[in-house]
From Swiss-Prot:
<keyword id="KW-0234">DNA repair</keyword>
<dbReference type="GO" id="GO:0030983">
    <property type="term" value="F:mismatched DNA binding"/>
</dbReference>
<dbReference type="Pfam" id="PF13589">
    <property type="entry name" value="HATPase_c_3"/>
</dbReference>
<dbReference type="Pfam" id="PF01119">
    <property type="entry name" value="DNA_mis_repair"/>
</dbReference>
<dbReference type="InterPro" id="IPR013507">
    <property type="entry name" value="DNA_mismatch_S5_2-like"/>
</dbReference>
<dbReference type="InterPro" id="IPR014762">
    <property type="entry name" value="DNA_mismatch_repair_CS"/>
</dbReference>
<dbReference type="GO" id="GO:0005524">
    <property type="term" value="F:ATP binding"/>
</dbReference>
<dbReference type="InterPro" id="IPR002099">
    <property type="entry name" value="MutL/Mlh/PMS"/>
</dbReference>
<comment type="function">
    <text>This protein is involved in the repair of mismatches in DNA. It is required for dam-dependent methyl-directed DNA mismatch repair. May act as a 'molecular matchmaker', a protein that promotes the formation of a stable complex between two or more DNA-binding proteins in an ATP-dependent manner without itself being part of a final effector complex.</text>
</comment>
<dbReference type="InterPro" id="IPR014721">
    <property type="entry name" value="Ribsml_uS5_D2-typ_fold_subgr"/>
</dbReference>
<dbReference type="InterPro" id="IPR042120">
    <property type="entry name" value="MutL_C_dimsub"/>
</dbReference>
<protein>
    <recommendedName>
        <fullName>DNA mismatch repair protein MutL</fullName>
    </recommendedName>
</protein>
<dbReference type="Pfam" id="PF08676">
    <property type="entry name" value="MutL_C"/>
</dbReference>
<dbReference type="InterPro" id="IPR014790">
    <property type="entry name" value="MutL_C"/>
</dbReference>
<dbReference type="InterPro" id="IPR036890">
    <property type="entry name" value="HATPase_C_sf"/>
</dbReference>
<dbReference type="InterPro" id="IPR020667">
    <property type="entry name" value="DNA_mismatch_repair_MutL"/>
</dbReference>
<dbReference type="InterPro" id="IPR037198">
    <property type="entry name" value="MutL_C_sf"/>
</dbReference>
């Protein structure tokens, strides 16, 4: 029997490894920029064309490489960062596995130009799909320049699953932000299709944060700095009043490396307990400095998950540091015993009333309220013996009235699509309003109760309104008939560049809803018009919320983005729990609900109505 196990060619092995390391153009930029920082670069330029699908170029002024190192750098597991296993626990560099360049070269066409200081000529190396196509001496500046073209050219399936240019650019900006926030001493530029997106000089950390997210964020931040024998924790946390449901900037860094850490995130949010509304988040930029021997970086392909040896102790230190910062800046509620602000109430002067005698009351000292015999005779009188005849008379009087309800009162079977689609909503298909009463009742400002043939229908008024508005906005987008209401004084909304890319992707759908936005440059937009019917809502918060929701959902397809926008706007414009409705308003809401195609559930799957049948109601009173 012949042997069937064989070694894979290096090119195939590199493509397999690239599947973990290089997932999208943003992954290429992350690896190349981190290599530049490890090489001691003080200035890094990133140039991107078509969101990295066509080309990516990273230029640095670092140490550069010799001819031999340039050739060896594209071999798997070739690295200058470590030499033995013990070095994994003393890492001070971003890279160490020796996989990044080999993985990039396996799925793209790469050109490297590099020169070390003191060398007259540098080296140019050309590689395509792991195959070296050329190497020669060239004149070039000190440092390295990597040009990556046609990413995934030899893996069509991977290239097909890349997202739109706007989404991929947003991913690039996210990775770029993570790198520049942890390296404020390095200057960076980022260009996309020839346009400059970022130009960040080397500055202090606070100025770097402002350079990335805008000057407005400076007013939201409180500085934090705690140094212990175990860990140093520094950075900034947001003021409680700046909390938001979506779009909070939340970053953890350890030893100059970005990481995700849900456990430490909980420590921060616990410190804000009772300071921010439930479900809202605050921004934070937290930097840990820990002995490399006490953390394990090598547990995730992208190195974004890090294990700490003293995780629980650091959790306590972090939580205490945040609480101390909030207390130091008076950002926590306190009990104020200061009497300076109390009103000046004059003391009562009784001298003018000294001659007044108090009234005297006489009473019988022999009176005993517990003596039954002393109680006055009861004035209770028995009801008339003819009370049955009295009620019988009222009954005859009521039956003699010729009462007929309004024939135009709401009937669910006329508005519901259940008749047109038998079996679509089995539990409400016979739930038309009986007795044609046209009368609805509101319970605790949240539920609408109405009588139906099968029993009692209970409707969540907010969810019903969301269902109605969602269908309305989806129809407006599909028909491109959104009605815009002009603003007398346009609002200005500011977005970081990573969110601008998402905004551009959904801009057309926003216009169909009725929003009118003008690009002012630098991530600023003027809101000149908003959809009619959303009076009282903050347009800035509304647009930011839609952008953040689109970012979370990924905006995979156009229809999904349209649904996200319609649902976000519907939730914002719907009536709130506790809002008192007139009977006419409740009737209109019920009519509108059963005029939509799917009245039973909200677009995100929450129950809108429930019916308690007549038998269950009768059982309650047996």
């Amino acid at each position: 029997m012949s042997d069937i196990i064989r070694l894979l060619p290096d090119s195939v092995a590199n493509q397999i490894a690239a599947g973990e390391v290089i997932q999208r153009p943003a992954s290429v930029i992350k690896e190349l920029v981190e290599n530049a920082i490890d090489a001691g670069a003080q200035h890094v330029d990133v140039l991107v064309v078509d969101a990295g699908k066509t080309s990516i170029q990273v230029i640095d002024d670092g140490k550069g490489m010799s001819e031999t190192d340039a050739r060896l750098s594209f071999e798997r597991h070739a690295t200058s960062k470590i030499r033995e296993a013990a070095d994994l626990f003393a890492l001070h560099t971003m890279g160490f596995r020796g996989e990044a360049l080999a993985s990039i070269a396996a799925v793209a066409q790469v050109e490297l130009r590099t020169r070390m200081e003191g060398e007259e000529l540098g080296t140019m190396l050309t590689i395509s799909g792991s195959k070296v196509e050329g190497q020669e001496a060239v004149s070039c500046p000190k440092g390295s320049s990597f040009s990556v073209k046609n990413l995934f050219f030899n893996v069509p399936a991977r290239r097909k699953f890349l997202k739109s240019n706007q989404t991929e650019l947003s991913n690039i900006l996210t990775e770029f932000e993570r790198i520049v926030l942890v390296n404020p001493e390095v200057s960076f530029t980022l260009h996309h299709n020839g346009a400059e997106l970022f130009n960040l000089p080397a500055l202090q950390l606070r100025q770097r944060i402002m350079g990335v997210f805008g000057k407005k964020i400076n007013q939201e931040l409180l500085s934090l700095d705690v140094d212990t024998t175990m860990v140093r924790v520094s950075g900034f946390v947001g003021k409680p009043e700046t909390a938001r449901k979506k779009g909070a900037r939340q970053y953890f860094f350890v030893n100059g490396r970005y990481m995700r850490h849900p456990y430490f995130h909980k420590a921060i949010m616990d410190a804000y307990e009772q300071l921010v509304p439930v479900g809202e988040q605050v921004s934070y930029f937290i930097y840990f400095e820990v002995d490399p021997a006490n953390i394990d970086v090598n547990i995730h392909p992208t190195k974004t998950e890090i294990k700490f040896e003293n995780e629980q102790a650091i959790w306590q230190i972090l939580a205490a540091a945040v609480k101390e910062t909030l207390g130091k800046f008076n950002a926590v509620p306190s009990i104020d015993f200061d009497t300076e602000g109390m009103p000046d109430i004059p003391a009562f002067d009784a001298s003018p009333y000294t001659g007044i005698q108090p009234p005297k009351t006489t009473y019988n000292p022999d009176y005993n309220p517990f003596n039954v015999s002393a109680a006055p005779p009861s004035s209770y009188s028995k009801p008339s013996k003819d009370w049955e005849q009295l009620y019988a008379g009222l009954e005859r009087h009521a039956s003699s009235q010729n009462f007929h309800p309004d024939e135009n009162d709401y009937r669910a079977e006329e508005a519901s699509p259940a008749e047109e689609n038998p079996g679509l909503y089995d539990h409400v298909e016979d739930s038309s309003v009986s007795e044609k009463s046209g009368q609805h009742y509101q319970f605790k400002g949240r539920f609408i109760l109405t009588s139906v043939k099968s029993g009692l229908m209970i409707i969540d008024q907010q969810r019903a309104h969301i269902r109605i508005l969602y269908d309305k906005y989806i129809d407006q987008i599909s028909r491109r008939q959104g009605v815009s209401q002009g603003m007398l004084f346009p609002d200005i909304v500011q977005f970081p560049l990573s969110e601008v890319a998402i905004l551009q992707e959904i801009m057309e759908d926003l216009s169909f809803l009725g929003f009118e936005l003008t690009d002012l440059g630098g991530g600023s937009y003027a809101i000149n018009g908003v959809p009619a019917g959303i009076e009282g809502l903050n347009p800035i918060d509304l647009i930011q919320n839609m952008v953040h929701t689109a970012m979370e959902k990924g905006g995979k397809v156009k229809e999904e983005v349209q649904s996200i926008l319609a649902l976000t706007l519907a939730k914002a414009a719907a009536i709130v729990p506790g809002q008192v409705l007139t009977n006419e308003e409740m009737t209109g809401l019920v009519d509108g609900l059963f005029a939509v195609a799917t009245p039973n559930y909200t677009p995100d799957g929450k129950t809108v109505l429930s019916v308690i049948n007549e038998d269950d109601l009768e059982k309650l009173f047996k």
